[in-house]
Structures are given as C-alpha cells and as structure tokens.
UniProtKB/Swiss-Prot annotation:
One Pfam family cited in the UniProt record for this chain: zf-U11-48K
Reaction catalyzed: cytidine(4) in tRNA(Pro) + S-adenosyl-L-methionine = 2'-O-methylcytidine(4) in tRNA(Pro) + S-adenosyl-L-homocysteine + H(+); cytidine(4) in tRNA(Gly)(GCC) + S-adenosyl-L-methionine = 2'-O-methylcytidine(4) in tRNA(Gly)(GCC) + S-adenosyl-L-homocysteine + H(+); adenosine(4) in tRNA(His) + S-adenosyl-L-methionine = 2'-O-methyladenosine(4) in tRNA(His) + S-adenosyl-L-homocysteine + H(+)
Gene from which the chain derives: TRM13
Protein name: tRNA:m(4)X modification enzyme TRM13
First and last residues of each zinc finger (CHHC U11-48K-type): 58-85
One GO molecular-function entry: tRNA methyltransferase activity
InterPro entries cross-referenced by the UniProt entry: Methyltransferase_TRM13 (IPR007871), Trm13 (IPR039044), TRM13/UPF0224_CHHC_Znf_dom (IPR022776), Znf_CCCH-type_TRM13 (IPR021721)
Main location: cytoplasm
Top-rank taxon, per record: Eukaryota
Region annotation (Disordered) ranges: 1-21
One Gene Ontology biological process: tRNA nucleoside ribose methylation
C-alpha cells in the first residue's frame, strides 16, 4: 500500500510538531508516528513520501519488500542493503558452523502436489468416514490426562502474574512432567536442555529457575543445567541474560551464605538456525546428556525436530517433552512417519492416496482449534461446506490431530524409546493441550 493511501489513517491532531525532526506519518499497527528523520522542509521521510509529492519514484526492495528505495538508486542500494549484509554475514558464519548442513533434517519424500479448494473439500468429504473408521479401530483408549503443577514455578512465577497465568500454567505442568519422568537435572547428573523453536527462551528460563530453586530448597549447592536455544528467528526481548540473573537472585534470597563469585551461572547457547538445517551433535558438549523440550512447536517444525533428534547422538538423548501445535501447518512431504499413515490407509482405505488423505487431515485438524463465537450452539452448521454441525467438526478435528500425533509417537517408539501422548493442560488454558513425552527405556 502506498504512503499516500495510509496518511489518511493518521488520527486527527496526530501530526508531529514542526520543531521535532521526525516523520509525520502515522503507523497504525504500532500506534505511533514514524521515527525516521525527513529531509529539511519535508513532513515525511523518504519511505513515507506520498506518491504525488513530486519526489523520485520508489519501489519495494527486491531483497526485503518491507522497505522501499528510490528506483534510480536501486542498484547501489542492493549493495548496501541491511538484508544483503545479513545474508553475507550468515554465509560467512556458516563456513565455520559445523552444526549447519542445508536440509539435513528434511525428508527425502517429494513434495505433495498442491490441491485447489474444490479438490481439497472433496478429499475431506472422502476422508471423514475413513478417519472415523480408523479412530474406532485404533484410538479407542483416550489419552492420559495429566495436568500437573510445579511448586517452584508457582513460588517464583505465579506471584509475578496476578491475572493471566495461561502460559505459566502450561510451563508449570510441562516442568513437573520433566521432573516426574526423570528428565531432570541434579548436582550429580548434569544435563543440557535443548529448546527447539525457543522464541525468547521462556520455557528454558523457568526450567532453570525451578531446577536451581529446588536444589537450594534442599540445602544443597545449585548446579544449573546447560541450555541450547534454537530458533530460526531472532526475537526481541530475549531472556538469555536472565538465566544468570535468576540464579544470582535465587541464591541471594534462599542461600545468601554462598559468596557471589561462587554462584554458578548456567551455560546458555543460542543459535539462529532453521531446524531443517541443524546437526545437533555438533552443538552438544561431549559426554553431556541432553533433553529436548519445546512449548507449542508449530506444524512441520515438530517433524523436523523429531528427525533431528533421531539423527543426533541418541546415546546421550535422555528423552524429550514437546507440546505440539498447528497440525494444519504440517506438510505431508515432511511428516515424520508417513509409513504409519500409509499402513492405516492400507487397512482402512487402500484406494486413497497418502498425500490427499494427509492434506484432508490438515484441513480437519484446524476444526478443533478454530474456536466458536460466544453463544454458538453445538448444532450450528453455519453454511459449512461439510454440512456438519460445529460440535461434530470439532470432534473430527481432534481425531485428525490424534492421528497425526500418534504417528509421531510411533516414530520414537520404533526407535526403542518409551513414547506417550498426554493431555498436559486444561483446554480452557490452551486448545493446544497435547504433549509428546519420550523417555529412554530404563
């Protein structure tokens, strides 16, 4: 959208004082004016000059269309664009990154052909009775409901959140599951937690807090775990520096007799890398056991993570706890266990292709989490192409999610691990309430 069409969205009276050298363009999404400096005598910066202002024509930058550049200066801009510098820096770093290998965790399966909406809807209608038949034959036992709570998280985290505790409740349950499953650090058992799709590193931060506080409450010295944080993005307000600050604060509160210079800080390593390209073995310290964790690892990222763990040093992999989400964002070509789905189809619908059935599963999986407007009854159809009431669509959505998740569970079971799907939080806390718990057999 051109600047001239957006200037009108600026609230009345929201123009900058002429004495302030800031662009007068209002950014509706950020609810503030642009912070760039305009040229002398101009009201807007070069990025937000109206198209009819008589200034040189501007075009989106080919490297990053989020910003524009004067058309006449495009060639010189490409040489100095920040995106060019970032790409060059990343390429230079990769030459010294033994943990990077392009596509190492991708599946060898060819990509599924794209389906138009009519084809996809027809596949869904065909898949509905197949899914119901599979669920009746294969998934009659409900998943174990285990909504747990960690005392240390409640002690430290909950007082900071007087109102919205949804994320804290999920973190508390996941952390307690790690403890009860034996996937926990101790002074005599150092481990490294690898958080996939870590974002700001929030889950790892509270694992660190809970582990250190538990050790201090027992009167023993604190031995924080190590952390490896993996994400392809570089979010703002990361928690990386908070790990050491939390350890120091907990010592000061609960064990002040330990001198500050003797309070161990956790080793925290962050890598900006796509899980698709991650060679995990090159990131881990030799001889140190590791545990994979993630909260709401989205769609295909879960499948890439499972393959990454399977290809990594399994001798040191104690287990994993992954809260999954967004099955509608999966990919039939990248799914971790296509053989599992193909075997189900061979028994229940041998004439249906894997790719089309999986695309239908993705579509139906979204029905479980799309939510309802307040007051919508279970019997509401609302013109949906399936002709099914909303309650029935939600039920089928949960069955589709279950099938996708069962294949992931079986993937690790086939590798010799104890693997379980469980409900780790209440549905009104999060609709994405299923976690995959993997443990090395005793």
């Amino acid at each position: 959208m051109e600047a001239s069409s957006l200037v009108a969205e600026r609230p009345t009276g929201g123009e900058q004082d002429p004495g302030h050298a800031r662009c007068a363009f209002y950014l509706p999404r950020k609810r503030r004016s642009c912070g760039m400096a305009p040229k002398a005598g101009a009201r807007f910066c070069a990025e937000h000059q109206p198209g009819d202002s008589g200034t040189a024509a501007r075009v989106p930058c080919p490297l990053d269309p989020r910003h524009t550049v004067a058309k006449a200066q495009l060639r010189s801009h490409l040489a100095r664009c920040n995106r060019t510098k970032q790409d060059q820096a990343l390429r230079a770093e990769r030459e010294h990154m033994p943990w990077y290998e392009a596509g190492v965790n991708s599946a060898a399966r060819p990509a599924a052909a794209a389906a138009d909406e009519a084809t996809l809807q027809a596949a869904v209608m065909r898949a509905i009775p197949v899914l119901a038949q599979i669920a009746e034959a294969e998934f009659r036992a409900p998943l174990r409901v285990a909504v747990l709570s960690n005392a240390q998280v409640e002690h430290v985290r909950f007082p900071q959140l007087p109102s919205n505790r949804k994320h804290a409740l999920q973190q508390s349950s996941l952390i307690q599951h790690l403890r009860e499953a034996g996937l926990w650090v101790a002074p005599e058992r150092p481990v490294a937690y690898v958080e996939f799709g870590c974002g700001r590193g929030e889950l790892s931060r509270y694992i660190n807090q809970a582990a250190v506080l538990e050790q201090l409450e027992r009167g023993g010295p604190a031995a924080p775990p190590a952390f490896v944080l993996v994400d392809r993005a570089c979010p703002r307000m990361k928690f990386d520096s908070k790990f050491a600050e939390d350890v120091a604060e907990l010592h000061a509160r609960f064990c002040p007799s330990v001198p500050p210079d003797e309070r161990p800080a956790p080793a925290v390593t962050r890598k900006k890398i796509d899980i698709r390209d991650l060679r995990l073995a090159a990131l881990l310290s030799p001889g140190l056991e590791h545990i994979a964790v993630s909260k709401h690892l989205c769609g295909v990222a879960t499948d890439l993570t499972l393959r990454c763990l399977a290809a990594g040093p399994r001798a040191s992999l104690c287990g994993a706890l992954i809260a999954m989400c967004c099955r509608h964002a999966c990919n039939p070509a990248e799914y971790a266990n296509p053989a599992y789905v193909e075997a189900l189809l061979a028994r229940h619908a041998p004439d249906m292709s894997y790719d089309l059935f999986f695309l239908a599963l993705m579509k139906m999986a979204s029905w479980a989490v799309s939510g309802r407007r307040p007051g919508v009854p279970d019997t509401e159809v609302g013109g949906h192409f399936s002709g099914l009431a909303i309650a029935e669509r939600e039920r089928l959505g949960h069955l589709a999610r279950r099938l996708v998740d069962e294949g992931r569970r079986q993937y690790f079971a086939d590798l010799g691990y104890d693997a379980e799907l469980l409900v780790y939080c209440e549905r009104d806390t999060s609709r994405e309430d299923i976690a995959l718990l993997v443990r090395r057999p005793a």
